Structure formats: structure tokens, C-alpha cells
């Protein structure tokens, strides 16, 4: 039986996600702050019409979201799939060229914030796009691919994904995986460990720490398993996509960041109908208490809509053969994801209540990512940066208010 038949009447996720009320001050803070999200929506999986993407990104711009790490490829996608996906995105964005800035450095993100355009930061959630050819990594850098996940859920030449590990197989990082990491480090592309099995991820972190000490790596969209494991609603084994405290602490040691996803089905056992600002704040707060405010980001991991996701899961059964975990979560109502434009201002109010300062939130919403971007993409470590990040943010904000007030 197809997964589509198992989930009748599946409705849009983020498109119909709840808009949460927020104070005027919080709404303005989001507009005044560089905010960098993350969405997991290749064409045909998340969005299927150009207007769909434009509407989503216009809502984000209106709310003050500066930019997004946008997923071009995942799972077992090939080089040819990557080229097709980039064409789909670029051709749609070419319809409104003034709305988009394609990011190769932090300066591009700052320019997008000043102008009120969308900063486009490409990512790939799989290394299978290389088609076995390491020389393609250099081309990825020129294309603006900012980060790469080695293995998505299942097993490939680099190692084992989180679902494979959940099902009992995680043999760790392979020589091919190490060879890819060498090329990522060589060309300044961030190693992303979300979707990766724990042993494979730990092996990758060991390799990075040994061969490239001081180069940060990240979990771009992963929830903390520890937030849910002791709750009454928790499932016996937890969600296979969530990470351990040990993994998060390793990222801190590298100087990287961890961003929680606002995806409802990964909120083990809770599986809300609509993720609340309080629940989103809980995710952020957990990581801040664990690894510190300098190593936490945000990543809605939005899919635009879950309808194509169900079809994708049906066509790629091995990637989602999880003992019905995801389907049980869907059946429980957790079919959505917190869309940043609809929830972030309310999350801001909640974090203010918990004692977070504006400086803290500026780091979490975008500053920590930009520090890692600058270090990996541009080779400028924080201690070697001639401009203090706070001074840099103030310069950007002054320019925005002078030339593009909103």
C-alpha cells in the first residue's frame, strides 16, 4: 500500500502552519536582525510551482527573514539531479531578479539584509551528487554550494545515515568519506552531519579534529534527543533523526553550531498539531544550556508542504523504513513545521521572557552561522577578523536604515 493511501487528506505543512501573535517589538527585532533559516525543499519534493516558492519567500522577506540555506539535493540524487534542481530554482528566481542575492561570502548576506532581498545559500544533503568524482567538489564551490551532508539516512559509499543506524547498521566513516572531507576542507565547504549515523558522524568529527583542527563543522537541522527522552510521551527508542548531547558537545569543541529543526514529527512522542513558540524556544534553550549561546542556530527545516514528501517516501522506501515512526507521527497530527515568517517573532517574545538578550538572539538567529561561514568559506577565524562582529552588525544596520528603511 502506498504511503499516500496511509495518510488520507494530507494537507500542506508550512503553507497552512499557524501564524502566532507577537509583540510589535519582537516583529521589529526580527526585521532589524540578520536571520538565516534552512529549508529542505528541492523542486518536486517541497514546491511544485514557481508561484509557490515566490509566495513563501515573499512572506519571509515581509517578516524580515534575511536568507535561507536552501536544499538542492538529498538522498541518492546525482550530479544530473543537482543541475536540474539548480536550474529549477534559478529559472524561477530569474523572474524576480531584484529579490535574490546568491551567496558566496558574508558580504552577500549583509547586502541582502540591507536591501531587503533574500540571501540564497545552497546546500546539498548528500554526497552522491559527486557521481564518484572528487573533482566535482571544486565545481560545487563555484556553484555556491555552502555545505554538504555526506550520507542521508541510509547507507552510501561514505558511511551510514541515521536511519541505517537506527536499524542496526553503522560501520562508520569510509575512506571515500574521508576523501570527500579532504576536498570540502580544501575548497571551503562546510561539513554538515545532520541525517548521519552516530558512529559515522563521530568518525567524521574525529577525522576533522585530527586533520583540520580548528575548522568548524555543524548539525544544520537536528533536534536534541535529550529534550524528549524522559518525557511521558517518548517512544521506546526515540526519533532516529535526533542527536545525542555527546555529538552536540563535539560540535561546540570544533567551533561550529547546532540548529534545531521545527519539524513536528521529530518531536518524539509529543507530535503537536502545531508547534508552539514555547516548544521552539525549548529546543533553542536546551542547546544553549548544553553548548552555549555561541554555538546555536535556527533551522526550521521547512518542507513548504508535506504532500510531495509522502510521495517521495513511498518512492524511496528504504530511506524511511522506520517501523512506522514517521507515519505514526503524521497520524498523531504532526504533519507540519514552524515556518519562520509565522513563528519567529513569537519565539523572540518567549526567549525574551526567559532572559535572553538581543545580543544572544542576534547570535542564534544568524550571527553564529555567519561566524562559521566566514571561517570556512573565507578562511578568517574570529580571532583574526579585523572587525568585531558587533561593530560589523551595527554598520550593516545603519546602512539598511539609511538606504532601505522598513
Tell what function each PLM region has.
Residues 170-206, 211, 215-222:
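Loop-centered beta-sheet repeat module
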Residues 1-8:
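Bacterial N-terminal signal peptides
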Residues 9-167, 186, 209, 217, ...:
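N-terminal hydrophobic targeting/anchoring segments and the immediately downstream early-domain regions
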Amino acid at each position: 500500500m502506498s504511503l499516500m493511501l496511509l495518510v488520507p487528506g494530507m494537507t500542506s505543512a508550512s503553507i497552512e502552519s499557524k501564524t502566532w501573535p507577537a509583540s510589535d517589538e519582537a516583529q521589529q527585532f526580527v526585521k532589524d536582525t540578520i536571520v538565516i533559516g534552512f529549508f529542505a525543499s528541492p523542486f518536486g519534493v517541497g514546491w511544485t510551482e514557481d508561484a509557490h516558492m515566490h509566495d513563501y519567500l515573499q512572506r519571509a522577506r515581509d517578516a524580515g527573514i534575511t536568507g535561507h540555506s536552501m536544499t538542492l539535493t538529498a538522498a541518492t540524487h546525482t550530479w544530473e539531479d543537482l543541475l536540474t534542481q539548480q536550474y529549477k530554482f534559478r529559472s524561477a528566481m530569474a523572474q524576480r531578479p531584484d529579490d535574490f542575492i546568491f551567496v558566496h561570502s558574508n558580504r552577500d548576506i549583509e547586502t541582502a539584509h540591507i536591501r531587503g532581498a533574500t540571501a540564497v545559500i545552497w546546500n546539498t544533503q548528500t554526497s552522491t551528487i559527486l557521481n564518484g568524482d572528487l573533482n566535482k567538489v571544486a565545481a560545487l564551490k563555484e556553484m555556491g554550494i555552502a555545505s554538504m551532508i555526506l550520507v542521508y539516512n541510509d547507507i552510501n559509499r561514505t558511511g551510514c545515515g541515521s536511519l541505517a543506524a537506527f536499524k542496526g547498521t553503522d560501520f562508520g566513516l569510509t575512506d571515500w568519506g574521508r576523501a570527500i572531507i579532504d576536498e570540502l576542507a580544501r575548497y571551503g565547504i562546510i561539513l554538515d552531519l545532520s541525517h548521519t549515523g552516530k558512529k559515522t558522524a563521530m568518525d567524521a568529527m574525529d577525522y576533522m579534529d585530527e586533520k583540520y583542527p580548528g575548522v568548524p563543522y555543524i548539525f544544520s537541522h537536528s533536534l536534541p534527543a535529550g529534550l524528549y527522552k524522559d518525557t511521558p510521551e517518548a517512544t521506546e527508542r526515540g526519533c532516529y533523526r535526533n542527536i545525542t548531547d555527546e555529538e552536540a558537545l563535539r560540535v561546540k569543541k570544533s567551533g561550529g553550531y547546532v540548529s534545531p529543526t521545527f519539524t513536528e514529527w521529530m518531536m518524539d512522542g509529543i507530535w503537536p498539531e502545531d508547534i508552539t513558540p514555547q516548544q521552539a524556544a525549548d529546543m533553542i534553550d536546551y542547546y544553549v544550556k548544553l553548548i552555549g549561546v555561541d554555538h546555536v542556530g535556527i533551522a526550521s527545516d521547512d518542507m513548504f508542504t508535506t504532500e510531495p514528501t509522502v510521495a517521495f517516501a513511498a518512492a524511496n522506501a528504504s530511506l524511511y523504513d522506520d517501523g512506522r515512526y514517521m507515519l505514526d507521527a503524521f497520524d498523531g497530527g504532526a504533519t507540519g513545521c514552524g515556518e519562520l515568517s509565522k513563528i519567529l517573532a513569537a519565539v523572540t517574545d518567549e526567549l525574551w521572557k526567559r532572559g535572553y538578550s538581543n545580543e544572544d538572539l542576534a547570535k542564534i538567529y544568524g550571527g553564529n552561522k555567519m561566524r562559521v561561514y566566514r571561517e570556512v568559506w573565507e578562511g578568517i577565524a574570529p580571532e583574526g577578523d579585523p572587525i568585531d562582529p558587533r561593530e560589523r552588525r551595527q554598520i550593516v544596520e545603519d546602512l539598511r536604515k539609511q538606504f532601505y528603511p522598513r
